[in-house]
Amino acid sequence: MFHHVSVMLNETIDYLNIKEDGVYVDCTLGGAGHALYLLNQLNDKGRLIAIDQDLTAIENAKEVLKEHLHKVTFVHNNFRELTNILNELEIEKVDGIYYDLGVSSPQLDVPERGFSYHNDAKLDMRMDQTQSLSAYEVVNQWSYEALVRIFFRYGEEKFSKQIARRIEAHREQQPIETTLELVDVIKEGIPAKARRKGGHPAKRVFQAIRIAVNDELSAFEDSVEQAIECVKVGGRISVITFHSLEDRLCKQIFQEFEKGPDVPRGLPVIPEAYTPKLKRVNRKPITATDDDLNENNRARSAKLRVAEILK
């Protein structure tokens, strides 16, 4: 069963200022917790476009949302196709869009998906099971230089070079096939003293490989920039991130669109062309409550940022 506890469920949706007849987009359907909370606030004229690249999540969501199916359009696609998705549905602008980034609990907890460093499984990590690139190809076929780059950039792993060297040495003998094989190789690349600090020694490398396999940061950047153009004036975008790379990227994008073009000096009135595209609703990210943490330990690293469209 695809069971998933949504993080900051109320805040994410409530900050969208839901209109009961509005049109909204859930870019990361997952376990459908946020979707259900939102749909309970929509009347029969309201509509939710629910996007996920994981077919298992969509099939599960149809059961979770069975009382609201007449208000939902399910889309199996990557959220970086947001504009195309809305164009195909003949929707010009929507009232709000939200993202719950990162891997959902069911994807982590089902060993066969290969996301977890706690369970043995084939190296996979594909959110979209129909794509060809998996963790196996990244680990066994990407160059030493490419591995160092993703471990450092996406995992902020200070022992990136040592770990990549160990992977390179192992795969020359035989392919690294499973998650726990990879964990053992990662541990070889980290000094014993460092392994005892900062959580599981494989956490950062697994995160880096997952981001690379699913092209997560690039896809999010593409999608949220499209979202800014797809939301009506007064509408909002909510984003929950789970690690510093995502949060930094979200903050930078919102800041960039909040700044607006440089205004020429001496203008008595600022023309609309020089007004910013959006304003940040919260300057500092909202973090999980104690209730969230009690229900889901993964909420500890969650941050919520919200922006309102101005033009």
Curated annotation (Swiss-Prot):
**Primary location class:** cytoplasm
State one Pfam family annotation.
Methyltransf_5
Q: Which reaction does it catalyse?
A: cytidine(1402) in 16S rRNA + S-adenosyl-L-methionine = N(4)-methylcytidine(1402) in 16S rRNA + S-adenosyl-L-homocysteine + H(+)
Q: Name one GO cellular component term.
A: cytoplasm
Q: Which UniProt keywords apply?
A: Cytoplasm, Methyltransferase, rRNA processing, S-adenosyl-L-methionine, Transferase
Q: Which GO terms describe its biological process?
A: rRNA base methylation
What the entry lists under HAMAP family is as follows: 16SrRNA_methyltr_H
What is this protein's record name?
Answer: Ribosomal RNA small subunit methyltransferase H
Source species: Staphylococcus epidermidis (strain ATCC 12228 / FDA PCI 1200)
